[in-house]
Amino acid sequence: MKWSEMASVNATQQHLNFSSSWEEDSSDNSFDEWTHKSVPLRSPCRTPRIQRHRNRSITVSPSVPTSPIPYAAWKKLRLCDSPSTPKSLLSKSTMPCSSSKTCRSQRFLRLSTAFERVPSVNINPFTPDTVRRNSEHYKRKSQRSDDDEDYGPRSKEIQNSSEDESFFLPSKRPAVSARMLSRYESEFLELACIGVGEFGSVYRCVKRLDGCMYAIKRSRRPIAGSANEQLALKEVYAHAVLGHHPHVVRYYSAWAEDDHMIIQNEYCDGGSLHDAITEKREQGEFFSVPELRDLLLQVSMGLKYIHNSGLVHLDIKPSNIFICRRSTLSAGGEGDSEEEDESHSSGVVYKIGDLGHVTSISSPQVEEGDSRFLAYEVLREDYTHLPKADIFALGLTVLLAAGASPLPQNGDDWHRLRQGELPNLPHELPALFKDLLKSLLDPDPTARPSATALCRHDVLCKERAGKLATQLRKELNVEKFRTAMLERELKEARLAATSPQQSCQPGSLPKAKRKLVGRNVARSVSFGFPGY
């Protein structure tokens, strides 16, 4: 090695020794304190000290050049395995605040970004206000710390900034991987296509795990970013909020595959009311008056539950009312009342489905449904009495089941129905029931009965009262039979209790016989203990 190269190495080592010594002097001080204080810098040309050991002799060959810095001085430079590298120093210089201030700013940053970041879950717009307020109060309580003195001013600033923004943040779209297994194909066995609509198709499937039948609705086209995306999300939101009710189609789960929405619902083995009306019309038949009363009563119960939940359906029609042929009792769902606790003797249960047009009563975002069942006030964008629009559509649905001709989409006949005129029917209805249907089609929405009033109407309660009387008579006969059986058992027990006292006189007891327990072991029949 030449002496010029050795000089350059020596200068480099001196510069590195300067960086290391500055790190030792300023490692305990923050960058902001260093900027306000003048730190005396050592001379960059100072040669590093060399510690020589007396007991060590260093022999230097005159022909072979060696490093001017021994091993001990080289280790003192702290260039090996040192965390204080130039990169770490640079990262420290980019943070102008002290350690205590950094922790506070980081806590504020985490708190503010928690409100500003895009949510990882969807926000259900149909969630009741009480549940939403409780969740926000719990979130604020969990974010506050006992030793955080600046929480009050920060929370006010965050609250003011969050109120300016829209409450409903963008919906979360699930990431779909090409290697992801299809849940629909792995968990369900498709049997048949039972319906095709504007949104997509409905399939009758068997779940491989539990062996039960379900109705799986799948969107026809990818809905991500399309107009149908909001309709699909509305249906999922409404089903999730409503829960389980005997007159609303039950919801189980929903997921997305390849940007297609898939909804797992309850399977109704009787098909839709539209199918039943079409089948009867082809056979020259129509629904009888008791069947019409049962239809009107059960759908009114479902609408009552939906309206009491703060929602409106806005798409009531025969194709969205489904039939279960099996005989079921009222399952005690949420919102049940005394008029719902009945057994359907006909074995037919009507359920409201297809909640794609559901919206909130307090803050409506109306998507107009089928124009044949649309109330006139909704067409005029008067949303002050939205639940009465469902009542109007229910009246037209009952008229179709009674044998009315298909409803017009526009024209004079369409306007005559909105004026409260009933269409011609193939058979005469009772006067009271006919007046009830006229009230459902009243041009004034305030004059139409509510779903709760329909459930208690005298015309519908008479039919229900007859069913209840028959059921009560059956239950009374069963209770009479049980009472007779209990009386007979009680009489026999009394006779058995008095007979030993009459037959057993003093001195008339038979002699006790000896019984063998085991081998050659005698034991008395009496099991009394001495002293008792």
Swiss-Prot record:
EC identifiers of the protein: 2.7.10.2
Q: What is this protein called?
A: Wee1-like protein kinase 2
**Location(s), subcellular:** Nucleus
Which species expresses this protein natively? Danio rerio
Q: Which reaction does it catalyse?
A: L-tyrosyl-[protein] + ATP = O-phospho-L-tyrosyl-[protein] + ADP + H(+)
Q: Where, by residue number, is the active site?
A: 315 (proton acceptor)
Note down the stretches annotated as region Disordered. Answer: 123-166
Q: For binding ATP, which residues are annotated in this chain's numbering?
A: 194-202, 217
Q: Which residues form the Protein kinase domain?
A: 188-465
Q: Name one GO cellular component term.
A: nucleus
UniProt keywords (A-Z) are:
ATP-binding, Coiled coil, Kinase, Magnesium, Meiosis, Metal-binding, Nucleotide-binding, Nucleus, Transferase, Tyrosine-protein kinase
The record, for SMART domains, names: S_TKc
Task: Give the protein family.
Answer: Belongs to the protein kinase superfamily. Ser/Thr protein kinase family. WEE1 subfamily.
